[in-house]
Every structure is written in C-alpha cells, then in structure tokens.
C-alpha cells in the first residue's frame, strides 16, 4: 500500500498557527517565502540546537557522507512549538521538516531511502503526491499518513495561488 492513515484527530489549525507564529514569519525565511518559484524546506529537528533550521537540511545533502544518520536529527530547533513538538514526539518522528510547495510547482521525481510520515497542514484540491505514477490527494483533515516514498514520487501543487504545507518526518519503526 502506498499510503495509509496512522493517526487521526491532529489539530492541524493549531499546528498551522504555531508554524506561522514562530517559524514561517521569521525574518530569516521571508526571502524564500516571497520567491514564487522556490519551495521552502524548514527543519524542525536538527543534529544540535544550534543548527540553522533553513540551511541545515540542504548543507547535509548526503547525510551519510557527513557521518550522520537521519535518526541524528532529533533535537527540537523550535522549543516554543508546544503542540507541534508533542505530535512529533507522539509519532516518534525524527528529521521533521516543514515543506512548503509554492503554486504551479513540483519537485523532481525521486525515491527516498525510507518511508515518510506526512501531516498535511495547508493544502487544496489541486495538490497531489504522485507515487509510482499514481496521484494521491492527502487531505488536511487532521490525519497523519505513512507514505511509501521509497517508490519514485513527487509532490505537485497545481494550484494557481495557494501554497501546499506539509509536516514531513520519519519513524524508525514504520520505515
């Protein structure tokens, strides 16, 4: 199965509010948020509390080559995200990021080394996760989904004017 629901009743509006208040509206992210062609990736967990939450995941492009495992990304970078961090802890997630896909964009078709947990926070009917050439719509209805991203996949935001925001991480036991 490509996608399965693993948790319900997550207050995604509360997560959205926390992310908007403490993360997305930070001055350091405004250039990226204002660029209509750039998808934004913000780390919520890092290898240490001093890790830069925006550039951390990109500078460690090949985590294994740098001597780290994905499980090493387990330190909360935004301790003020009380509810969001409690959901991350409840799902035993690590290397959790906020992924914002701008309108009329997609990422390259790729496969990840592990399955990913997706919690859609802000989405619309024109957003899809293509897995192995099948389009799936993940609803922002308070569910956490385990997605088999070890298969070739890409997120697509075919909206004309709305961002797609997902909380994405991993769980050792579910990968």
Functional labels for PLM-detected ranges:
Residues 107-109, 127-129, 138, 147-160, ...:
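Short beta-strand His + acidic residue motifs that chelate non-heme Fe in jelly-roll/DSBH
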Residues 117-120, 144-146, 160-175:
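A short hydrophobic beta-strand segment most commonly corresponding to one strand
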Residues 83-103:
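A short glycine-rich, His/Asp/Glu-containing loop-to-beta-strand
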Residues 120-140:
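A short beta-strand-loop-beta hairpin characteristic of the jelly-roll/cupin
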Residues 1-88:
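Non-heme Fe(II)/2-oxoglutarate
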Residues 113, 121-123, 133, 149, ...:
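Short loop/turn positions at the edges of beta-strands in beta-sheet-rich folds
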Residues 100-101, 111-127:
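Short, conserved beta-strand element in jelly-roll/cupin
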Residues 103, 140-141:
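Short, flexible surface segments
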């Amino acid at each position: 199965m490509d996608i399965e629901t693993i948790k319900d009743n997550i207050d995604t509006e509360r997560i959205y509010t926390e992310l908007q208040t403490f993360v997305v509206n930070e001055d350091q992210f405004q250039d990226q948020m204002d660029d209509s062609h750039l998808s934004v990736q913000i780390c919520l967990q890092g290898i240490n509390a001093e890790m830069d939450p925006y550039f951390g995941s990109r500078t460690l492009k090949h985590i294994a080559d740098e001597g780290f495992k994905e499980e090493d990304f387990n330190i909360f970078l935004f301790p003020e995200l009380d509810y969001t961090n409690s959901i991350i802890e409840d799902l035993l997630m690590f290397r959790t990021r906020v992924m914002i896909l701008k309108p009329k964009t997609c990422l390259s078709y790729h496969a990840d080394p592990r399955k990913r947990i997706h919690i859609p926070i802000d989405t619309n009917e024109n957003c899809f996760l293509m897995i192995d050439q099948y389009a799936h719509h993940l609803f922002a209805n308070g569910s956490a989904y385990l997605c088999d991203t070890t298969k070739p996949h890409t997120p697509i935001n075919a909206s004309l004017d709305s961002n797609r925001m997902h909380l994405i991480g991993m769980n050792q036991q579910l990968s």
